[in-house]
Amino acid sequence: MSTESMIRDLELAEEALKRKARGPLGLGRCLCLTLISSFLLAGATVLFCLLHFGVIGPQKEQESTDTFLDMKPLTQRVRSLQNESAKPVAHLIADQLAEGQLLWVGDVANTLLMNGMELVDNQLVLPSTGLYLVYSQLLYKGSQCGKESLVLTHKISRFTLSYQKKVTLLANIRSSCRKAAEDDGEPSAWYEPVYLAGVFQLTEGDKLVVDTNYPENLDFAEPGQLYFGAIAL
């Protein structure tokens, strides 16, 4: 085969390839590429518009900022609760084993002695100056009313270095057997609760004490019936 015929065959093969590329399959490939390019261009245009008008990007940053601002009051509230929980508080109950005398305990279930509060010689010692809610309840009982009722006294006193003596903060007087006396019936068992509570400005080192004139008539059946406490406000 001559060189000229070989060159002619190559030219014919090249022409055949070009015709195939211009055929239906080649046209489909070109159309597919054109559509893909159009979609990519449209997508890029939409993304640019969203970024330009702040629909995405800056808005998410603003939402993040708003969320942080909303969290600030919650954080401040949590810190406030932590500070409040650091205030002195005490809740004492009567020792059920010391029936006949009023002795307080603060190291058993359902009692509190926190943040500096102390129980010394049956007195509650305050660790700091400020407003305090002071409270106490005593429950008295008797088997028979009899002809004469008992005059029950319940009081909370404060001993401070300024006065060098006990000063009464709260006091209450009750008469036992009131219901039986009103009914004028047969003698029966009686129960009389006496509750005290008040808010006072107290001083660091003040001592609070509960007194009653009939400790032998206190009802020690349940620990929640006789209690004494103070809460810093």
From Swiss-Prot:
Pfam families from the UniProt entry: TNF
Cysteines engaged in disulfide bonds, as pairs: 145-177
Positions carrying Phosphoserine: 2
Lipid-acceptor residues (N6-myristoyl lysine): 20
InterPro entries assigned to the protein according to its UniProt record, in alphabetical order: TNF, TNF_alpha, TNF_CS, TNF_dom, Tumour_necrosis_fac-like_dom
SMART domains hit by this protein: TNF
Annotated GO biological process: extrinsic apoptotic signaling pathway via death domain receptors; immune response; positive regulation of canonical NF-kappaB signal transduction; positive regulation of extrinsic apoptotic signaling pathway; positive regulation of NF-kappaB transcription factor activity; positive regulation of transcription by RNA polymerase II; regulation of biological quality; regulation of developmental process
Site (Cleavage): 34-35, 49-52, 77-78
Protein topology in the membrane: Single-pass type II membrane protein
Post-translational modification: The soluble form derives from the membrane form by proteolytic processing. The membrane-bound form is further proteolytically processed by SPPL2A or SPPL2B through regulated intramembrane proteolysis producing TNF intracellular domains (ICD1 and ICD2) released in the cytosol and TNF C-domain 1 and C-domain 2 secreted into the extracellular space.
Compartments, record wording: Cell membrane
Ranges of the Extracellular topological domain: 57-233
Transmembrane segments: 36-56
UniProt topological domain (Cytoplasmic) ranges: 1-35
Keywords associated with the record: Cell membrane, Cytokine, Disulfide bond, Lipoprotein, Membrane, Myristate, Phosphoprotein, Secreted, Signal-anchor, Transmembrane, Transmembrane helix
Record family assignment: Belongs to the tumor necrosis factor family.
Task of the protein: Cytokine that binds to TNFRSF1A/TNFR1 and TNFRSF1B/TNFBR. It is mainly secreted by macrophages and can induce cell death of certain tumor cell lines. It is potent pyrogen causing fever by direct action or by stimulation of interleukin-1 secretion and is implicated in the induction of cachexia, Under certain conditions it can stimulate cell proliferation and induce cell differentiation. Induces insulin resistance in adipocytes via inhibition of insulin-induced IRS1 tyrosine phosphorylation and insulin-induced glucose uptake.
Subunit structure and binding partners: Homotrimer. Interacts with SPPL2B.
Protein known as: Tumor necrosis factor
Lineage: Eukaryota, Metazoa, Chordata, Craniata, Vertebrata
